[in-house]
Amino acid sequence: MRLYDSIDIFSWFKIYFIENAGMAFGIKLVDTYILTIFRILVVSWVGVQIFKIIKRGTFKFGFILSLSMILAGATGNIIDSVFYGVLFEHSYGQVAKFLPEAGGYATFLNGKVVDMLSFPLIVTTWPSWMPIWGGQDFIFFRPIFNVADSSICVSAFVLIIFYRKSLFEILAKEKKDDV
């Protein structure tokens, strides 16, 4: 697929190829390589925490699974941002070539993350009488994301809703160990 190409699976589900240089929803606060290094540090910290939790044996399986799914999703996004730009040429107006002779479109740690899942659940137009947005297109659930993003978001939601106490216990223990 070329950049911004899409395939309609259903009216409410599309495969839509974009490259995201930032964080969730394309937010870009820092350079890509700084973001990638930050992701690597966070994933390392989460991995150490999972190891400690399993070693202690005091937490429920669902809690460990949720942390592991966050780790897996974040690792997937890191792999994408570290290697995608090195292994592929740009996708503007063409299908990206794998291992191009001239090299990829980005240097190591400066690649983008491929997002492709789009769920435009409601597509309509704002009524013309509506101030500011009148007559403009309205799409409910506009974000485009990937499986790794889903893994991170769903697992974070599960942790906050069902394992909040366990999460705070780990953070408090980590803070106590630092002092």
Regions found by a protein language model. Name each.
Residues 1-179:
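Alpha-helical transmembrane bundles and membrane-interface segments of multipass inner-membrane proteins
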